[in-house]
Amino acid sequence: MDITLRMSDHALTARAAAAAGIVLLQNKNWTLPLLPQEDGAPLPVAVFGVKQLQTPAFDKTMTPWRSIGVLDGLAASETVRPDALLARKYRTWAVEHPEGGEMPLTNLDFGALRHDCAAAVV
């Protein structure tokens, strides 16, 4: 399928609508918005959950021409930097478990994540 200018315009409109439609249930300690560090460097974040890789935004009858998961969206940001080791563990889990399911958290080093990351996205 060729991507047209009109499709690109629609993608921008859809992105803006999705961003405006996100519901924040509780913003404890002003966690959001995630901002860069004081020196301007991206904020290191731990992103949890296998749905970070391919966020379901469509029903089974639709085939989107473009879909961006949570992890890829955050990685493209200049504001935050997802933890690469944690992302690799989730990608490996997804490849080894194509039937789905959530990765057990018992294999994660939460002490290292707490030390290396300033925020967590679940």
What are these regions (language model features)?
Residues 1-122:
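C-terminal non-catalytic regions of proteins with extracellular/luminal or membrane-system context
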